[in-house]
Amino acid sequence: MIASSLKIMLWDKEIGRLSWDARRGVSFFEYNPAFLGGRLDPFPLVASVKSPASRRPIMGDRETKLYRKLPPFLADSLPDAWGNQVFECWRIQNGIRNQEITPLEILSFIGKRGMGALEFIPESSGIRKSEKLNMKLLTDLAQRIFLERENVRLLPDESLTMQSLIAVGTSAGGRQPKAIIAINPETREIRSGQIAGHKGFDYCILKFVDCVLHWY
């Protein structure tokens, strides 16, 4: 399903909607009127709630390639090289044509897993809080995606591992494969770090480099 409109959430508050104008090939953002009356001002330099312009649609940037036709203050939530590789693998696995993909589809895929405070609804379903991660399988699959890129083909038994990799690895920035995880130092149990509230767990970024795990 191709996303044409997304709720933009900040700390459980809907700050506005991001929509895609298919005819013009550009996105536009509209503040939630109820949010404009509050005290939060998430984008004070470029789209302040105090500005009269915030009462009108804010168009995406069609000139700067980096922003991918999104308003600059939302484009920063797009994944970097590694997250894009995972997304591309997911797209191929689900039979979605590349020409059907808009920036909104990518943000919808990120959902609640972004590195910043913004969340994009609808979200891509991830692994549940109770599920543990198999680091050996994650590492092997991450290396294959990184090395084979668009030529990678998932085996039937790798589908669940791919879901886990999506849940932990799509928002971490940079070129190299990474994952955001939560680890219990006593039991050595590892879970997704994209879900808050794991008691007794430390959160860190895991970097896959030549099948060696680096912890930060």
Where are these regions (language model features)?
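Phosphate/dinucleotide-binding and metal-coordinating scaffold of catalytic cores
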Residues: 1-216
